[in-house]
């Protein structure tokens, strides 16, 4: 299989078993002339560096924003930021990289996953995977600080109650965009320092 074939099969988000997906791929793309086991596929896929997927993702995002007619709300482009904890396979390598959560039941390898999503154009524009004890605010600050999309003007970053902090407001005002804003839901007792 070529690098392109591995990437194509991997991003298909197969609804069937891996072997059924591989068989369908080879039937459609290679006229069924090749048989490939899921073990051989997994071994080959493991040789692909995660950076390849990051670069592919960034290329898709950049291409979209170069060419798309972007929707806006009263001249503003809205980007939601949120995070969650994601359970990962329990391997030593992942445990060392992302940490183990032990607060509920058996220990579980988890990562903090944060995402910035274009609310009006339906596109994930940035993500972060971090240690399970990392802060959603730190991930949001990092995504806001590295925000660089072509043809985006007047971005507004929308976040829930867990995010309000002066450091996030500062991060959004440091961007090169002329008008940048952050909008956070806050508890009633929230106090601005």
Regions found by a protein language model. Name each.
Residues 1-193:
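Conserved, well-structured functional cores that handle cations and Mg-NTP chemistry
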């Amino acid at each position: 299989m070529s690098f392109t074939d591995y990437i194509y099969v991997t991003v298909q988000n197969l609804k069937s078993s891996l072997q059924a997906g591989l068989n369908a791929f080879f039937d459609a793309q290679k006229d069924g002339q090749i048989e490939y086991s899921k073990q051989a596929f997994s071994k080959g896929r493991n040789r692909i560096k995660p950076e390849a997927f990051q670069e592919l993702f960034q290329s898709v995002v950049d291409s979209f924003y170069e060419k798309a007619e972007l929707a806006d709300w009263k001249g503003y482009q809205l980007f939601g930021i949120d995070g969650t904890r994601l359970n990962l396979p329990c391997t030593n390598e992942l445990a060392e990289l992302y940490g183990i959560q032990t607060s509920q039941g058996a220990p579980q390898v988890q990562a903090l996953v944060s995402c910035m999503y274009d609310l009006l154009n339906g596109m994930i524009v940035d993500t972060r995977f971090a240690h399970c004890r990392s802060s959603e605010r730190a991930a949001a600050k990092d995504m806001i600080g590295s925000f660089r999309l072509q043809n985006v003007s007047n971005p507004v970053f929308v976040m829930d109650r867990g995010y309000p902090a002066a450091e996030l407001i500062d991060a959004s005002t440091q961007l090169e965009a002329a008008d940048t804003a952050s909008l956070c839901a806050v508890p009633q007792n929230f106090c601005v320092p």
